[in-house]
Amino acid sequence: ARNLILEETRQDLQENHGVFTFDYGNLSQRTPLTWSTYDHRPRFGTNMLGLRNRLSVLSEAYSYLEYPKRVEVTREFVLGIVRRAKIHGEALMQLEASLDEEASKGKPFSLGLDTALVADTPGTILLGAVDEVPIEGLGVRRVDRDEHVPTLVGLRLSFEPGRYSVHPRAWAIEKPEPGDQEVLKRHGIQFRILDAPVTCTSRRFQITEAQRAKRLFQAHYELTLVGEWEGGPTELP
C-alpha cells in the first residue's frame, strides 16, 4: 500500500501540481545529517490503526511555509491521496478484507516488541533555507526562503522489532473500572461480560520495574514497564 498510494501520489503532485512531498520525519541537529521518521509509538494514531488492519496516512506540511501555503499544499496532498485511494480502492478493500478474515480464524500471530528505527541508508532530501523574522517578545520565526538544495543524508524511514511476542486471542480485565465499557465501545472493540466462571489458559504480565523518563515528551513523562509473563490455568472472573 505504501508504494501503491504514497509513491504514486508523490509523483502526481510533483509533476502536475508543483508540490514536493517526502516521508514524514525530522532532521538531526548534528553531523552526519540523518532524516528520521516517527517511531512505533501510537501517538499519531497511524500505528494504532495499523494494528487493527486498517491503512492510515500521516500528513504534515513543511512548518516554515507561510500559513496560507501550508493550507494549500495540505489540500493538494489530501486530494492526491483520495484520488489514488479511488483508483486502487478495490485492491485496498480486498487487502483489508483478507487481513480481517485471517484474524477472524483465531490463529495465533505475533506482534513486534522492542521496536527501533532501522539503520540509515544514503538518500537525498530537499533542504530548505529560511529567514529568521524577529517577533517582539517571542524570539524569532523561521520562514521558508523558497531556496531548496538537494542534500545527501542518512534516511531512516521505517522501524523494525527486536523480538516478537504471540498475541493472545483475548484480553481479560479482572477488575474493570466503571467507564471501561464505554471506552471499548468507542474504539469499536468487541467484548463480552462473563456471567459465569470460565477456566482457560492465560498469561499474566508481572511488573518488576517501572522506568519513567526524566524529560517531558509532548507534555508527558513516558512510562516503560519491565517484567515477565507468567502462564498457566486461570479461572475468570
Question: For each of these PLM feature ranges, what is it?
Answer:
Residues 1-237:
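Structured catalytic-domain cores with a bias toward divalent-metal coordination
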